[in-house]
Amino acid sequence: MSGFSRKRNGEILATFSHYEGAILKSLTEQILELLGEGDAPADPLLAVVGISSNDSLPEDPVLARLLPDAYEEERDAAEFRRYTEHSAREKKRAHAHAIRDILMENLGDHALDLTAPGLNKREELHFIISEEKAHMWLMGLNDMRLALGTRLNVTSDAQERFAALSDENPDKGIFNLFAWLGWLQEILLEILTPDSDPTTAR
């Protein structure tokens, strides 16, 4: 079963099929591509001190969800964004890379192409994630879920609305992926929460 568990020696074990791992890798690459747009300060001096030349909410709705305004008042929001957006993007990139890099190490080249002849998509990957990386995974999974939720316009009635869709509707599959990411977040958060009683692996 895919997900995370705490081994008896305290290590965090991640388990995914090749197919699930490839999907997560693809999602992180989409997040990285999105975060790479429009963040380079025009002034080299601003780049040195980490100040962005951007002071407005991104036009892309997903990017706006990932990098929201901190204040309702436009002037305050713009000023805060200039001083924080660059570092916020860098942190989110680091979270995405933490997921992508370990998947790249464990998937192997043959598993990166889901159409490769003879590939067993259900074959499981097992790898250890450090406590530090696990926290980065938690944040990265959240960014993926926010991105999908924004694209799908997920609201309070989402479960009923998407359940009513036919299996042929691509939005239903994307919503199932959205729900799966939420489940992964929940499991990992439980493992990282002190005094919790997560599923324990040998």
Report the location of each language-model feature.
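Charged, alpha-helix-forming regions
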Residues: 1-128, 132-202
